[in-house]
Amino acid sequence: MTVLLDSNIIIYAAQPEHADLRCFIEQHDPAVSAISVVEVLGFHRLSDDERTHFEEFFTASRILAVSDLVISEAVSLRQQRKMTLGDALIGATALTDNLILVTRNVDDFGWIAGLRVLDPFAST
């Protein structure tokens, strides 16, 4: 099953105590949105070690670009309900690419018709 990893899942997976999450990710066919690259690497307080880890992760990842279709879908989502730009673009990417969105923030996305959302912490 191909999944789209939300930014929070990428961050949690880097923490030593989340070995089960890393195993979950390895068992699926993960992709990430280009928005997650900006959200994770753009965090101003990353240590050098954290930055290196995430850069290596993204280098090895399948990164999905923000297409015109994704932009159109994100606009539609934001017109329906207040949500962050990042969440709108990530949700729209999952919708347009027909991917399961893996996130810990189910409430931020659960209202979106047709979007499949999975919280790996709830299933472990």
Model-derived features: positions:
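Acidic, PIN/NYN-like endoribonuclease modules and their adjacent C-terminal/linker elements
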Residues: 91, 95-124
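Short, well-structured N-terminal submotif of metal-dependent ribonuclease cores
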Residues: 1-32, 42-55, 123-124
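Donor nucleotide-sugar recognition loop
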Residues: 80-86
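Acidic catalytic patch
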Residues: 59-80
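Alpha-helix capping/helix-boundary segments
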Residues: 9-10, 36, 70, 89-90, ...
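Short, structured coil segments at secondary-structure junctions
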Residues: 26, 57-59, 112-113
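Short loop->beta-strand "edge-of-pocket" segments that line small-molecule binding or catalytic clefts
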Residues: 3, 29-32, 60, 64, ...
